[in-house]
């Protein structure tokens, strides 16, 4: 790796890094990477652990997985179990951002966010990121 590559940052912005693992073969050409997925599956965990210390994981979790809103996404309890599996295998919780998406500005939507955040409290993940479908001003309680 040359000096230029030591300054390069990778990010998986297209597709889902938990499904398309092609990012793994490019890790030697970057200093570190931000890996984004809705699917922290077992194959993904295996690949991610090869690069631990060199990646920040953005684990997108929805409280609507398996519903009409997110029919092809795992529910948040599955995601929680998989994130715990990743941490128990040696991945640092400090290198994980919990992305709660979508946040719907309704009483039920707030309850969904509370359920997701509450379940993930035992993981040691301290960086939640909420993607609101409404103005940020309506979510002052999350600041």
Task: Enumerate the predicted regions with their spans.
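Conserved AdoMet/S-adenosylmethionine-binding subsite of the radical SAM
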Residues: 2-143
């Amino acid at each position: 790796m040359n000096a230029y590559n030591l300054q390069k940052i990778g990010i998986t912005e297209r597709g889902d890094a938990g499904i398309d693992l092609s990012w793994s073969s490019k890790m030697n050409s970057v200093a570190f990477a931000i890996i984004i997925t809705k699917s922290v599956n077992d194959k993904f965990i295996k690949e991610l652990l090869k690069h631990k210390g060199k990646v920040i994981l953005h684990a997108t979790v929805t409280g609507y997985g398996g519903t009409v809103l997110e029919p092809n996404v795992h529910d948040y309890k599955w995601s929680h179990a998989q994130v715990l599996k990743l941490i128990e295998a040696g991945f640092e919780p400090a290198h994980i951002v919990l992305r709660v998406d979508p946040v719907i500005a309704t009483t039920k939507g707030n309850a969904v966010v509370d359920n997701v955040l509450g379940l993930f409290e035992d993981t040691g993940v301290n960086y939640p990121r909420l993607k609101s479908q409404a103005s940020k001003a309506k979510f002052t309680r999350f600041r």
